[in-house]
């Protein structure tokens, strides 16, 4: 079933837990008609939530669109930037400020991300209310399973909200009033997410969510297990409620209850990664196949955003945004000549040396560009040649302002794509087993164990020599393996490097406190709810 069922549930748009919690607009469709049996209850109260995993609207979707979660997790790091190219890509300083960590509480894009995340959280609460009020039409098993799946979706969105904003409200009822909404500490949100996922995981289907069929694109048990591994790996960060004091608890002294046993954070991460292995996930022999057109049969991908240009409006913008105009034109569309890998990123891949990582050509367009074996020519008659080492944050005075920087690759080009290559048949990879292996390697090293088997399994797959399993090599390998997948900000924070100087970026005054590791609560939300307090130093 290559479909995420279109929902017909009428849902209010909410602003920072305001209008949705104060008003209950009448549904536009007959309630009895859309909730008259178990199948319709599932479609309209559960499956409807999956419409929000991806998007074609700016700042919405977990990945695929611009000015949203992915950009704040990628273009704020040493991985990539949107450089200013003369009159292009200034956008009021948006991209430069993003890279330099100069955002503030009035950033409209951060507000839109907050609004998007809590829209889905509130809709999840509404769905739980609907399921509860229609139990007479459901079996006990259906009530249990529908409820578990919605709670898992809600936990997923709370995870992204906590990761970005730290202190956020925990709201589990659709009928709560605005004046009842209070802000929770990050550690409380973390515990809530872990408890929710551990509680519902046994009721979730154990199917592979990335494969076509009845569970395609859904939050199944392996998705929950991956997320629990990620939560455990970052437990030192998420349990820290005062992230500007320079102190945090060691993962060896943070405990989880797992399968009836007490385990520290690193042991917990390892356990959940092992569960994924037992659930049948493994590395694909061909790294690139995970990102191919029609990648639904990957044995490695765990959770994806389903894309089908004939069925969905979800989009993948990053190839379109990155390639030079002429490059996009060679595929019959257009492009925006924007996003590039930083110089430090391409150097990490060994670009310009005799030891280039074998993943470089898959992940980037660099040097002379060929399409169907033919060169692409610029308006001046010269061939298009990307210059990875000439990238600067502001290229306005550079002779390479149109061609500087290695461009986004990774996903196979869908030659039948719509909307200038934004509507494609490559599902967007959110979670995959390759990441789980690197998480397991890191957790083992942090726990005083040997993570070389997991780390070097990743390198074996792409024909690269073994390296020692230490934290420096693991962080580098995460860049080599997971570039363009939206994990770099989280990784740099966990390794204590996000607030440091890096390529073309000088730390802000007081940034050594770590205040930029969490984004500001949007000012509009503070104005609407006086019980919300701003994060430190904003």
Model feature map: region roles:
Residues 19-22, 117-120, 192-194, 215, ...:
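Long, intrinsically disordered, low-complexity segments
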Residues 19-74, 249-250, 525-538:
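Membrane-proximal, proline-rich intrinsically disordered regions
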Residues 34, 38-47, 51-61, 85-165, ...:
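Conserved, well-structured interaction surfaces
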Residues 55, 286, 290-294, 298-392, ...:
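Glycine-rich, aromatic-lined ligand/substrate-binding cores of catalytic
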Residues 60-82, 174, 204-223, 237-328, ...:
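Short, surface-exposed recognition loops and adjoining beta-strand edges that mediate ligand/DNA contacts
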Residues 90-102, 351-431:
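Flexible, polar/acidic helix-loop-strand segments at domain edges
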